[in-house]
């Protein structure tokens, strides 16, 4: 169930255009438009889904004292590496992460009530860099929907 559920979410981000690159939320996410229940109002989000058939290097920019974090989630919904907060290069491989596909999410602090601060946070988002010899392609399993739904209730799986 975990792999099917994670693949469903990965595909939803791929369908938004977030494959092999980062998509950036340029303003705080309204409460009624949150894709997960824990999104914060003082954070701008960046996200991407990557194929680790080829190593991926992500550069976290130097943000001074502004908070930024990078979270990595594999297809089994594990965080195989610690959340990263410091500037620098981080290389992800299939061996290190444990699955072919990975979700990478960034949070960048922004004052939701200050348009100038949001512009500064947007500039930081634009400095997040991705290096990869080949972006690959997204080929998640074709999970049988009825089995996947049944497994959402553990007693029926």
List where the protein language model places each region.
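A compositional/structural signature for long, glycine/proline-rich flexible linkers
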Residues: 1-157
């Amino acid at each position: 169930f975990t792999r099917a559920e994670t693949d469903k979410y990965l595909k939803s981000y791929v369908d938004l255009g977030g494959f092999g690159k980062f998509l950036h939320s340029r303003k705080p996410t309204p409460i009624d438009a949150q894709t997960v229940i824990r999104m914060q109002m003082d954070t701008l989000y960046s996200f991407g889904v990557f194929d680790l058939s080829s190593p991926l290097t992500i550069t976290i920019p130097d943000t001074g004292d502004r908070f930024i974090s990078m979270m990595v989630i594999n297809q089994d919904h594990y965080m195989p590496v610690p959340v990263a907060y410091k500037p620098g290069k981080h290389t992800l491989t299939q061996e290190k992460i444990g699955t072919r596909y990975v979700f990478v999410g960034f949070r960048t602090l922004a004052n939701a009530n200050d348009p100038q601060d949001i512009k500064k946070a947007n500039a930081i988002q634009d400095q997040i860099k991705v290096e990869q010899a080949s972006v690959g392609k997204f080929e998640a399993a074709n999970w049988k929907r009825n089995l996947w739904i049944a497994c959402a209730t553990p007693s029926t799986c």
